[in-house]
């Protein structure tokens, strides 16, 4: 029996975010290309070496990237849109696709399955010459071999998932383009095999949600590849859910190993194995450590899983690995000594998860006695956190038990509410607003850092925040926006800010994970019962409202987004945690309303990303996600206008859910997806307030008035002008002031032009 340890992918960002800092230094011309490439190589090799030192045998090579692994694959295969043809160097093309430039719109960015990581969407164009433009996995494989003497495991994105994630082709073209991918994949795999790669990991996460016909189509591609590369040892890797529905077919694919997720797809994969077994001539790669959360594994449960598998499968060969890439977890917990002992002990970041894999390997190869002490430690840790007072609050349980049906709905239907709101708010046709945040300049960040370090007093910090707030209230008035925001200068992050003010949350010092590009986030840790403590946004919002006669929006992050953008306790259902957060936000919303705030925005940008991969599981998730939003927002008066905001989603999947939220106004990020949501609205109706984002805030370019007007014009063909709002795609926190002001001026002018046209045509 052969058992090996493996990792699917390692966090890219570096222990001190060296990767992020190097990228941003290069983008701002503080370092040249040579220094950039040298530093990135150092970081890349450090990561490979770190995994070897932890005892991992099959170390992933090629999971490292300068921006995004899907973008790497697109560039490698020649999926380069023609609008970037004037760029000649690799890095210029690569980063233009990722970020855009002054004259070039970036490729679309969207969520990687149901995670909080974003990938760059590959674009197919007619006449595209698909070929292996650059065998990057081979270069990195040889680099690790030559520099470190490590014979790694190349990791590539599989052809089927890659093309399914791409856009720009019709469904009728899919099969033809898929066949065109065979040749470059054959070349890629042949060259890796010839260079000595013992095993090559081919990621196909899309396999968790394919139809029978699609699986057969994928199998034909793998058969075509196998025919040309018969001796390459391929590990077909799935993750994020089970492949239960198509398991019987998938285990017949012409590959030597198959990787299954036994954390997020445990029940389905076990059921399939109990029914169909597992081939004796293949290796089973067992994803047994959660690659998406930060809690210590239950080693007893994992060992029981292996006992079950060994009884049910024909193979004697196993790989012990995480459920998915560790990209989604922070690197190491050793710096988190400020946390309580019970919480610190319960955590396992990427490096600790690698140690867990080695422990499991020892137990499987040498017997459980070999890790007796570690097993006892793990059992004690789990008992301590389960029995913690923070996880057993009677007041939280009582509030949940007391909920009634009427707590989940507004008193009047939308049409009647909106009439009352129009009278109260006196807004013009096509009102303009922003999504919430304004630029967090170096001065803002530095002042916050000084306050947190005790260099300046609370009073000095509050005065600074008030000064910034007033400055941006005046900017908004001068620009001519209709509904203003206070700018969120006191907030580091839209989830962290609320977590710091609610019971049940804790925060890491260095628990960073990559969100998109160089943007890293430090998700809160929901370890206990969530409860309201004191007002969280009242002071800043009321102050902003006191500065202007115009309406100022209260700004909150919704319960489902707080849930989906946090590391969440795994001892109770996510639905219950979401309801706890909703009850706390309900209290805050009531306080805002009683303080005179008449428009309150509750952002849910992450509602779509939390959806399960399988359509059969959608309804259950959407039901409690919508109920959570309604629980938070339904206690306000009819005259109070509830807004929400969403971004980066396949909205056609959730139009009904958006409607069910019963928000008076929803703003949706649409500009970067090149009008897809507008197309969705051609085939359905949305009869509530809606704002379709008119410019992409993730790019530094300032769009013209005409660009924005064109989006407004297209939107008004499918949206009722009476209910239509004009806004940017997202918050403006990451942009510079000199980018934001002209862009908003253009947006307001586009709104005025649209109003004039509507009046002329009336």
From Swiss-Prot:
Hey, which pathway is this one from? Amino-acid biosynthesis; L-methionine biosynthesis via de novo pathway; L-methionine from L-homocysteine (MetE route): step 1/1
Q: Record-annotated residues binding Zn(2+)?
A: 645, 647, 669, 730
Provide the binding site for 5-methyltetrahydropteroyltri-L-glutamate.
17-20, 111, 519-520, 565, 609
**Which keywords does the record carry?**
Amino-acid biosynthesis, Metal-binding, Methionine biosynthesis, Methyltransferase, Repeat, Transferase, Zinc
EC numbers for this chain: 2.1.1.14
- Cofactor binding, per record: Binds 1 zinc ion per subunit.
GO biological process annotation, one example: methylation
| Enzyme class per UniProt | transferase
- Cofactors (names): Zn(2+)
Q: Reaction catalysed?
A: 5-methyltetrahydropteroyltri-L-glutamate + L-homocysteine = tetrahydropteroyltri-L-glutamate + L-methionine
Please list the residues that bind L-homocysteine.
435-437, 488, 603
Whether GTP-binding counts among this entry's keywords is: no
Q: Which residues form the active site?
A: 698
Q: Name one Pfam family in it.
A: Meth_synt_1
Q: Which InterPro entries does the record cross-reference, listed alphabetically?
A: Cbl-indep_Met_Synth_N, Cobalamin-indep_Met_synthase, Met_Synth_C/arc, UROD/MetE-like_sf
Q: Which domain of life does the UniProt lineage start with?
A: Bacteria
For the ligand (L-methionine), the binding residues are 435-437, 488, 603
* CDD domains xrefs: CIMS_C_terminal_like (cd03311), CIMS_N_terminal_like (cd03312)
Q: Name one GO molecular function term.
A: zinc ion binding
Q: What does this protein do?
A: Catalyzes the transfer of a methyl group from 5-methyltetrahydrofolate to homocysteine resulting in methionine formation.
Which family, according to UniProt?
A: Belongs to the vitamin-B12 independent methionine synthase family.
Tell me the protein's name: 5-methyltetrahydropteroyltriglutamate--homocysteine methyltransferase
């Amino acid at each position: 029996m052969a058992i090996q340890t493996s990792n699917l992918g390692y966090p890219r960002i570096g222990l001190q975010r060296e990767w992020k800092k190097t990228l941003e230094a290069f983008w701002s011309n503080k370092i040249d290309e040579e220094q950039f490439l040298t530093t990135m190589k150092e970081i890349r090799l450090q990561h490979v070496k770190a995994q070897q030192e932890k005892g991992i045998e099959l170390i992933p090579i090629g999971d490292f990237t300068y921006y995004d692994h899907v973008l790497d694959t697109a560039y490698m295969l020649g999926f380069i849109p023609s609008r970037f043809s004037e760029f000649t160097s690799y890095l210029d093309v690569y980063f233009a696709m990722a970020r855009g430039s002054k004259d070039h719109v970036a490729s679309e960015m969207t969520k990687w399955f149901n995670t909080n990581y974003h990938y760059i969407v590959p674009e197919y164009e007619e006449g595209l010459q698909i070929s292996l433009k650059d065998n990057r996995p081979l270069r990195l494989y040889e680099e690790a071999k030559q520099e470190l003497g490590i014979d790694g495991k190349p990791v590539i994105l599989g052809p089927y998932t890659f093309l399914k994630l791409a856009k720009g082709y019709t469904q009728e073209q899919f099969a033809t383009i898929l066949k065109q991918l065979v040749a470059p994949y054959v070349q890629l795999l042949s060259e890796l095999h010839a260079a000595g790669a013992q095993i090559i990991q081919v990621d196909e996460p899309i396999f968790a949600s394919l139809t029978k016909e699609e699986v057969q189509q994928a199998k034909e591609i793998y058969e075509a590849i196998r025919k040309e590369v018969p001796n390459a040892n391929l590990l077909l890797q799935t993750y994020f859910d089970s492949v239960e529905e198509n398991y019987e077919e998938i285990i017949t694919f012409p590959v030597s190993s198959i990787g299954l997720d036994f954390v997020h797809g445990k029940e389905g994969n076990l059921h399939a194995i109990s029914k169909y077994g597992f081939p004796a001539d293949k290796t089973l790669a067992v994803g047994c450590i959660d690659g998406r959360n930060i809690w210590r594994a239950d080693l007893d449960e994992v060992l029981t899983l292996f006992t079950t598998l060994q009884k049910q499968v024909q193979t004697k060969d196993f790989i012990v690995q995480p459920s998915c890439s560790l990209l989604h977890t922070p690197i190491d917990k050793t710096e988190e000594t400020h946390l309580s002992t019970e919480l610190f002990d319960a955590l396992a970041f990427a490096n600790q998860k690698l140690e867990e894999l080695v422990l499991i390997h020892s137990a499987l190869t040498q017997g459980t006695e070999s890790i007796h002490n570690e097993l006892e430690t793990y059992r004690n840790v789990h008992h301590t956190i389960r029995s913690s007072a923070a996880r057993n609050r009677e007041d939280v349980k009582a509030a949940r038990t007391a909920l009634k049906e009427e707590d989940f709905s507004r008193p009047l239907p939308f049409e009647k509410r909106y009439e009352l709101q129009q009278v109260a708010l006196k807004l013009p046709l096509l009102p303009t607003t922003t999504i919430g945040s304004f630029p967090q300049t170096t001065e803002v960040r530095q002042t916050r850092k000084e306050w947190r370090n005790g260099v300046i007093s609370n009073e000095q910090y509050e005065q600074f925040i008030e000064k910034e707030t007033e400055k941006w209230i005046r900017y908004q008035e001068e620009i001519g926006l209709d509904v203003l925001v206070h700018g969120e200068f006191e907030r580091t992050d839209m989830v962290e800010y609320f977590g710091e003010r609610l019971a049940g949350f804790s925060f890491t010092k260095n628990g960073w994970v990559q969100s998109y590009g160089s943007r890293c986030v430090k998700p809160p840790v929901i370890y206990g019962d969530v409860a309201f403590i004191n007002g969280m946004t009242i002071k800043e919002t009321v102050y902003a409202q006191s500065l202007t006669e115009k309406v100022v929006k209260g700004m909150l992050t919704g319960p489902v987004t707080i849930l989906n953008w946090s590391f969440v306790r795994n001892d109770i259902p996510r639905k219950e945690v979401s309801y706890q957060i909703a009850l706390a936000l309900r209290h805050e919303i009531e306080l805002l309303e009683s303080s005179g705030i008449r428009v309150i925005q509750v952002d849910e940008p992450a509602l779509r990303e939390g959806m399960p991969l399988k359509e059969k599981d959608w309804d259950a998730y959407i039901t409690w996600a919508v109920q959570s939003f309604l629980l938070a927002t339904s206690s306000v008066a009819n005259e109070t206008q509830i807004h929400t905001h969403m971004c980066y989603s396949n909205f056609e999947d959730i139009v009904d859910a958006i409607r069910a939220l019963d928000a008076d106004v929803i703003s949706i990020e649409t500009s970067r997806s090149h009008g897809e949501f507008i197309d969705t609205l051609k085939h359905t109706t949305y009869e509530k307030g809606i704002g379709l984002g008119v410019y992409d805030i993730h790019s530094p370019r300032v769009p013209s008035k005409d660009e924005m007007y064109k989006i407004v014009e297209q939107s008004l063909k499918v949206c009722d002008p009476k209910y239509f709002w004009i806004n940017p795609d997202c918050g403006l926190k990451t942009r510079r002031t000199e980018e934001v002001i002209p862009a908003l001026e253009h947006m307001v002018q586009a709104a005025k032009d649209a109003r004039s046209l509507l009046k002329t045509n009336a």
